[in-house]
């Protein structure tokens, strides 16, 4: 039995979707439970050359034996969820998704409020998905819950019971986080943050398990960190430099161009401390050194790539255990 939490180490877009899907294929967890704020974060998963962008369904969906749970701490957009269930029907999603009875539900009024608020949309750079206003209503105890919506009835369940019973039965559980620690309402660069905490502790709470149940915390870092929206970015490079390095990316949810920077060892160390990291997953090593593209053996990593990995381990103090060398699941080095 192991309970593993996967958390973003930067401002989101670190490649958590690929890492989570890989771990699901390798470790075969019986339950993949999603924590995080809501549909304001997108994950990209590539399966057999086809790319899927999802915002509600847990990214462990390619593993057909896993139950896919959305914890009570997560906000649900009914339309987004139903569209994803339909989009992923070849993976038998409909019979595997469990939405907690007590998930809060984002309604159209929340999205309108999010988009019309100039402070959120222009100064903060909100995604406009209604999460912030919905969380305000939750705090005011006026937000409607999943159990009140007929469209969600086929998916309803008690996620906390599901996760805890799986662990008690000696099964593997994976808890997937969204966004990144540096967007945390409490530990990020306030006010340029999301509307809730995005640390490993928060994700455990979102799905209803206590801290003593967690065995592993894997923090995901991208070799070149990115950020969508406003806010400080200490190691940000200019657009010309990013283009010269071939680093042009766009957000899964907003479609906005991502700001790109150099790896920040000091912030990485702080993030690992905040999350109690037991391991690091490093993505886009092939962007740092294109000769590493597609590698699956640690001993084949180039001198340049290996030096980068060793520098991270020395300066951050946490071992790099999973390395992504391309978008496909098999383009991964795993030394856990």
Swiss-Prot record:
Pfam families: Adenylsucc_synt. The active site is at residues 13, 43. Coiled coil: none annotated. Substrate binds at residues 252-258. GO terms for biological process: 'de novo' AMP biosynthetic process; IMP metabolic process. Pathway: Purine metabolism; AMP biosynthesis via de novo pathway; AMP from IMP: step 1/2. Homodimer. Plays an important role in the de novo pathway of purine nucleotide biosynthesis. Catalyzes the first committed step in the biosynthesis of AMP from IMP. PANTHER family: ADENYLOSUCCINATE SYNTHETASE (PTHR11846:SF0). This is Adenylosuccinate synthetase. It comes from Methanococcus aeolicus (strain ATCC BAA-1280 / DSM 17508 / OCM 812 / Nankai-3). The lineage of its organism: Archaea, Methanobacteriati, Methanobacteriota, Methanomada group, Methanococci.
């Amino acid at each position: 039995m192991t309970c593993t939490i996967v958390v973003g180490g930067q401002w989101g877009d670190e490649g958590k979707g690929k890492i989570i899907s890989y771990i699901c294929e390798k470790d075969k967890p019986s339950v993949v439970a999603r924590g995080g704020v809501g549909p304001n974060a997108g994950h990209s998963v590539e399966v057999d050359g086809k790319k899927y962008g999802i915002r509600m369904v847990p990214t462990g969906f390619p593993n057909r034996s896993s139950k896919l749970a959305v914890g009570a701490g997560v906000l649900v957009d009914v339309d987004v969820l139903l569209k994803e269930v339909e989009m992923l029907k070849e993976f038998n999603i409909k019979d595997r998704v469990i939405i907690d009875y007590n998930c809060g539900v984002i309604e159209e009024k929340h999205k309108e409020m999010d988009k019309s608020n100039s402070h959120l949309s222009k100064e903060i750079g909100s995604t406009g998905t209604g999460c912030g206003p919905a969380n305000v209503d939750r705090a005011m105890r006026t937000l409607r819950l999943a159990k009140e919506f007929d469209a969600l009835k086929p998916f309803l369940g008690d996620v906390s019971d599901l996760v805890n019973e799986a662990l008690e039965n000696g099964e593997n559980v994976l808890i997937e986080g969204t966004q990144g620690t540096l967007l945390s309402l409490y530990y990020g660069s306030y006010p340029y943050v999301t509307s809730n905490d995005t640390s490993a502790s928060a994700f455990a709470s979102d799905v209803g398990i206590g801290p003593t149940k967690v065995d592993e915390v894997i923090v995901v870092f991208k070799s070149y960190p990115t950020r969508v929206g406003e806010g400080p970015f200490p190691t940000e490079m200019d657009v010309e430099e990013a283009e010269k390095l071939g680093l042009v990316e766009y957000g899964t949810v907003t479609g906005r161009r991502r700001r790109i920077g150099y790896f920040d060892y000091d912030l990485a160390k702080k993030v690992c401390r905040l999350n109690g990291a037991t391991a690091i997953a490093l993505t886009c090593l092939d962007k740092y050194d294109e000769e590493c593209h597609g590698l699956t053996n640690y001993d084949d990593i180039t001198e340049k790539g290996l030096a980068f990995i060793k520098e991270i381990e020395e300066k951050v103090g946490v071992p790099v255990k999973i390395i992504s060398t391309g978008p496909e699941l098999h383009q991964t080095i795993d030394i856990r």
